[in-house]
C-alpha cells in the first residue's frame, strides 16, 4: 500500500491495487407506506441469494436511472411507481463486480406489489431493519435512513 498526496491539498488518498471489476449500474426504489419500507428477498441462484434488498435492477444501455426503475418495478413487482428524488448513491466493490447503486424515493401509483422475480416482499418499520440481512452495498443507505426519520412518514 502506498499513500499519495493530492497536489494542492492537505489530505491523502489511500492507493491500493484493485482487480478490474465488471461495473454494474443499478437503480433501487425506496417505497414508504404507513411508516414502513418495502424490501424484497433475492431469489436462490443469483448473486447474494437470500439477502433482502430494495426493489430495482440493472440499468440498460441508453436508459435513464428513472426509466430503469419504472421498468424493473413493473417486471419484478407487477405495479407502477412514480420515481421521485434521488435519496442516496453508493459505489461498492464486491470481489466479482462493482455496483454503482442509486436509491430513489418512489410512490406506488398502480397496483399492489407482488413477488414476481423475488422470493418474498416485506413492509418493515425502522425498528425492524436490524432483523433482516442486506447486501454490503445497502449498508451505507441503511445507516443514512436511520438518521432520517422524516423519510419514514
Language model feature labels by segment:
Residues 11-12:
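Aromatic (phenylalanine/tyrosine) cluster motif
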Residues 16-37, 58:
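Conserved N-terminal beta-strand and adjoining loop/helix that marks the start
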Residues 46-50:
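A conserved beta-turn-beta hairpin within the catalytic core of GNAT-like acetyltransferases
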Residues 54-86, 125:
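The catalytic Nudix box helix
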Residues 80, 89-112, 122, 145:
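Active-site-adjacent beta-strand/loop module that shapes the phosphate/pyrophosphate-binding cleft
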Residues 105, 114-145:
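NUDIX/MutT-family hydrolases
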Amino acid at each position: 500500500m502506498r499513500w499519495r498526496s493530492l497536489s494542492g491539498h492537505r489530505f491523502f488518498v489511500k492507493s491500493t491495487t484493485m482487480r478490474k471489476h465488471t461495473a454494474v449500474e443499478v437503480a433501487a426504489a425506496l417505497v414508504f407506506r404507513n411508516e414502513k419500507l418495502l424490501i424484497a428477498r433475492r431469489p436462490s441462484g443469483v448473486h447474494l441469494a437470500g439477502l433482502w434488498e430494495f426493489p430495482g435492477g440493472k440499468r440498460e444501455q441508453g436508459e435513464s436511472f428513472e426509466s430503469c426503475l419504472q421498468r424493473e418495478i413493473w417486471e419484478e413487482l407487477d405495479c407502477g411507481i412514480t420515481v421521485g428524488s434521488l435519496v442516496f448513491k453508493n459505489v461498492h466493490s464486491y470481489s466479482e463486480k462493482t455496483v454503482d447503486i442509486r436509491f430513489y424515493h418512489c410512490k406506488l401509483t398502480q397496483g399492489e406489489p407482488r413477488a414476481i422475480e423475488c422470493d418474498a416482499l416485506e413492509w418493515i418499520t425502522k425498528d425492524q431493519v436490524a432483523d433482516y440481512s442486506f447486501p454490503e452495498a445497502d449498508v451505507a443507505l441503511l445507516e443514512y435512513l436511520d438518521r432520517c426519520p422524516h423519510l419514514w412518514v
